[in-house]
A protein has these predicted regions:
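N-terminal secretory signal peptides and thylakoid transit peptides that target proteins
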Residues: 1-16
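N-proximal helix/coil linker or "cap" segments that precede and/or mark the start of modular domains
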Residues: 19-46
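A short beta-strand-turn-helix
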Residues: 48-68
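Short active-site neighborhood of thiol/selenol oxidoreductases, capturing the structured segment around
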Residues: 62-83
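Conserved helix-turn-beta segment immediately C-terminal to the redox Cys motif
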Residues: 86-108
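Thiol-based oxidoreductase modules, predominantly thioredoxin-like and allied folds used
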Residues: 104-117, 134-143
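Short, internal strand/loop/helix patches
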Residues: 124-169
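Thiol-/selenol-based redox modules, centered on thioredoxin-like
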Residues: 161-210
């Protein structure tokens, strides 16, 4: 973990396909369609998901619209140990952000194995790691979770690598939906660097206020 630096976070930001989508959409000839609408339609399917507390939510309308968010994929039966380490690291991020999580920053973790990770399983997992308010674990129909994974850019061109669930658990994506600012970094980056990187998602007024 110590070898993952802030420079790595910033380098990965250039690979974030959602951020690149903003650049692509700006060249569209249809001026009546905003870049925000283009990004929403292209990357944010409004799928119905279920939280670890058993509540039905829509991905765009309820989870990310008008919010600053973090997004990552995981599964509770992670074979190689990456998910427990990443979850524990993100718990430290949540503690650094304090009461901002659930107020103006929202954390979301999506399961890669919805057939096993029911809301009850996710609730036990969150409790075991001491996850606080404002961080939601989500499941859904297998086809919907797969579609969401690909739309959000948690995918590899190599089909063999893409088929390995563990290859999708190492990245944390974060963004400011209304400002169309999106980036990514390794989920095992130092918590302080993740928080610092996320601060640049905010407008100057919010940065001064925090």
């Amino acid at each position: 973990m110590n070898g993952i630096t802030r420079r790595t976070c910033l380098a990965l930001s250039a690979l974030a396909p959602i951020a690149l989508g903003a650049l692509t959409s700006s060249s569209r000839s249809d001026a009546s369609v905003s870049s925000r609408e283009v990004i929403r339609d292209r990357y944010f399917p409004n799928l119905v998901l279920t939280t670890h507390e058993g509540r039905k939510v829509r991905f765009y309308d309820d989870l990310i619209k008008d919010k600053i968010v973090t997004l990552n994929f995981f599964y509770t039966q992670c074979e190689d140990g990456r998910c427990p380490l990443a979850t524990a690291n993100l718990v430290r991020v949540q503690k650094l952000l304090k009461d901002r999580v659930g107020r103006d920053i929202f954390m979301y973790s999506f399961t890669l194995t919805p057939e096993h990770d029911t809301p009850a399983v996710l609730k036990r997992y969150a409790k075991a790691y001491g996850v606080g308010p404002g961080w939601t674990f989500l499941t859904g129909e297998p086809g919907d979770m797969e579609r969401l994974r690909r739309k959000l850019g948690f995918a590899w061109a190599n089909p063999i690598r893409d088929a390995r669930k563990a290859s999708h658990t190492g990245t944390l994506r974060y963004g400011n939906e209304p400002l169309q600012l999106w980036s990514a970094c390794p989920a095992m980056s130092k918590p302080e660097w993740i928080v610092e990187s996320m601060s640049w998602l905010e407008g100057p007024n919010e940065r001064r206020a925090s």
